[in-house]
Amino acid sequence: YYLGTMSREMEGAFYCMDSTGVMTELFDGVGNANGLDWDVKRDLFYFNDTPTYKTDVFTFKDGKLSDRRTVTKYHGIGNPDGMTMDMDGMLWVALWGGYRIVRLNPYSGEIIDYIELPVANVASCIFGGDDFSELFITTASHYTDLREQPLAGSVFRVKTQTCGKPIYRFKGDRKYD
């Protein structure tokens, strides 16, 4: 199980919890550990650290992260928050303050599509539905005037032209699940 902490001073960290509950710090210098996903076919791990305005990728081999590099930076269009991946290996990134979800080609760093929403703070997204072709999008009402954005805090469901993949389940002791 992988998780991170938050720190306004970029003093947070990113951890792995094994099946027995033992935590190992993988890296530090984290502001707000967000959007995590794996491309298991290519041994890649994607990571959003919201205040850095970027999505990074690591090589992921034998449970170890290495070779961190930046996929893209989102200056001026919102901060990357939650994230998921579709079956084509493209990333769908929620942009906090950006009124949208973007579909990102992680190999070129290009935004190849987007879904506009009527709320600023788009928090996360995940594929679901019978064939995983529906994108469920969470939003937040935190720091929002609900008179201006009455749908803030809502969950949206959008039919896409692609399919996502099932989520990974933690295989450890059920007390940690």
Please state what every model-predicted region is.
Residues D37-R69:
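Glycine- and Gly-Pro-enriched alpha-helical subdomains that act as flexible
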Residues M6-G12, T50-Y53, W96-G97, L146-L151:
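Short, solvent-exposed loop/turn segments at conserved positions within beta-propeller repeat blades
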Residues I126-D177:
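Blade-level signature of beta-propeller repeat domains, shared across WD40, Kelch, NHL, RCC1
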